[in-house]
Swiss-Prot record:
One of its GO terms (cellular component) is cytosol. This is Keratin-associated protein 5-7. The gene is KRTAP5-7. Residues 35-158 are annotated as: 7 X 4 AA repeats of C-C-X-P. Sequence repeats lie at residues 35-38, 41-44, 47-50, 116-119, 126-129, 145-148, 155-158. Belongs to the KRTAP type 5 family. The lineage of its organism: Eukaryota, Metazoa, Chordata, Craniata, Vertebrata. In the hair cortex, hair keratin intermediate filaments are embedded in an interfilamentous matrix, consisting of hair keratin-associated protein (KRTAP), which are essential for the formation of a rigid and resistant hair shaft through their extensive disulfide bond cross-linking with abundant cysteine residues of hair keratins. The matrix proteins include the high-sulfur and high-glycine-tyrosine keratins. Keywords: Keratin, Repeat. Interacts with hair keratins.
């Protein structure tokens, strides 16, 4: 009954689910044979089929996390190998999202993994777009900036820019 086995009557809708499945099998969480269909892979930990039509997620009886923002089908999921993990909360839409999310509960003292769906950060608001990757400059920063906050008075408020040492 695994999502990636393609042996439960998936037929032609399997779309190459077999060898590209990675470790999805046992972590399917009850997706059943429906997960072998490219347009129905809505469980957070079962997305190793070639594509998932975001518009069809509702009918799959599950949730795919960032599916709403992908604006189409997600391709190449099988090559990512494995389950989506906590990446659903990041709202990501890239293939790299199918690796464990790097900042689901904050980075702490360590930086994020390169497999994170969004740029790295070192705050609790991880996995959001970086606001000041090239320094403060004249533009204001967002509170969700991935870089460490500045302490310089010249920084915008809320201060969140990469400070020059």
């Amino acid at each position: 009954m695994g999502c990636c086995g393609c042996s439960e009557g998936c037929g032609s809708g399997c779309g190459g689910c077999g060898s590209g499945c990675g470790g999805c099998g046992s972590g399917c969480g009850g997706c059943g044979s429906s997960c072998c269909v490219p347009v129905c892979c809505c469980k957070p930990v079962c997305c190793c089929v070639p594509a998932c039509s975001c518009s069809s997620c509702g009918s799959c009886g599950g949730s795919k996390g960032g599916c709403g923002s992908c604006g189409g089908s997600k391709g190449g999921c099988g090559s990512c190998g494995g389950s989506k993990g906590g990446c659903g909360s990041c709202g990501c839409s890239q293939c790299s999202c199918y690796k464990p999310c790097c900042c689901s509960s904050g980075c702490g003292s360590s930086c994020c993994q390169s497999s994170c769906c969004k740029p790295c950060c070192c705050q609790s608001s991880c996995c959001k777009p970086c606001c000041c990757s090239s320094g403060c400059g004249s533009s204001c920063c967002q509170s969700s900036c991935c870089n460490p906050c500045c302490s310089q008075s010249s920084c915008c408020v809320p201060v969140c820019c990469q400070c020059k040492i």
